[in-house]
Curated annotation (Swiss-Prot):
InterPro entries: Hyethyz_kinase, Ribokinase-like. GO terms for molecular function: ATP binding; hydroxyethylthiazole kinase activity; magnesium ion binding. Pathway: Cofactor biosynthesis; thiamine diphosphate biosynthesis; 4-methyl-5-(2-phosphoethyl)-thiazole from 5-(2-hydroxyethyl)-4-methylthiazole: step 1/1. One of its GO terms (biological process) is thiamine biosynthetic process. Keywords: ATP-binding, Kinase, Magnesium, Metal-binding, Nucleotide-binding, Thiamine biosynthesis, Transferase. It comes from Actinobacillus succinogenes (strain ATCC 55618 / DSM 22257 / CCUG 43843 / 130Z). The lineage of its organism: Bacteria, Pseudomonadati, Pseudomonadota, Gammaproteobacteria, Pasteurellales. This is Hydroxyethylthiazole kinase.
């Protein structure tokens, strides 16, 4: 596949409005800055509509919810839909509690999302599949060998692109599905690594035309996975060093290295 959106992110520095969780705010902002995007971290209901007038992308991440956040997310999501700003949903722990289930269902009913990014448990919940997650972690379930089909089914259900992240990532628009075979076992050991991926996807959508969101999302996930591989080189269990290396790699990676390292496979039914 061709890689063209990474350079556009660096050239255009898209302003991304992140309504994300308090655990990952700093890590997400630093990752976006390293990549070349411009994060705007605000969850004030009184200003989120105005922000959509100049933002290029919106991330909604439900990791640490409160009622004010929910209000801000609904207002921002609807405003983004009106102005044509792409919206990414990260339904952290979607099936873990009744409160989260109801909030996610409300968001999906009232906001049009360009991309939904989640782990197997979260995407499985959206598909109605019997996955057993542990808190906000992925867990295992009946469709553990059919992740490609799982991503595809949710993409069809909600008419959007789905990024199912894990040991390998599956990206689907409901018709086409790619498997990204890059990555490292160290990424899940860093709090917020999945949440930052959602933010990176949103940045790539911010420089992409709507008809190419699938390619932009696939490229974002590939950049992320390859950066993780490069950051892990020479490390075993030094997770703190890995986290710093990973931010560095997001800033250093370029299309030539990406094309050389990427292992992206088209899935066939």
């Amino acid at each position: 596949m061709q890689f063209r959106y990474l350079s556009l992110v660096r050239q255009q520095a898209p302003l991304e409005h992140c309504i994300t969780n308090i655990v990952v705010t700093n890590f997400s902002a630093n990752g976006l800055l390293a990549l070349g995007a411009s994060p705007f971290m605000s969850a004030m209901p009184q200003e989120v509509t105005e922000i959509q007038n100049f933002a290029q992308a919106l991330l909604i991440n439900i990791g640490t919810l409160n009622q004010s956040d929910v209000e801000a997310m609904l207002i921002a999501g609807k405003a983004a839909n009106r102005t044509g700003v792409p919206v990414v949903l990260d339904p952290v722990g979607a099936g873990a509690t009744l409160f989260r289930r109801k909030i996610v269902e409300q968001f999906l009913a009232e906001i049009n999302f360009a991309v939904i990014r989640g782990n197997a448990a979260e995407i499985g919940f959206l598909a109605g599949t019997d996955w057993q997650g542990k808190g906000v972690d992925a867990g295992t379930g009946a469709d553990s060998e059919n992740l490609s089909r799982l991503a595809q089914s949710v993409a069809q259900k909600y008419r959007c692109v789905v990024a199912l992240s894990g040991e390998t990532d599956f990206i689907s628009d409901g018709l086409k599905t790619y498997q990204i075979c890059n990555g490292t076992r160290m990424l899940p050991k860093v709090t917020g690594s999945g949440c930052l991926l959602g933010a990176v996807i949103a940045a790539f959508l911010g420089v992409s035309p709507p008809q190419d969101y699938f390619s932009a999302c696939t490229e974002a996930c590939t950049v992320y996975a390859v950066a993780g591989e490069l950051a892990a080189q020479g490390l075993s269990n030094e997770y703190g060093s890995f986290a710093m290396n990973f931010i560095n790699q997001l800033g250093a990676i370029h299309e030539t290295r990406l094309a050389d390292k990427a292992r992206v496979l088209a899935q066939h039914e």
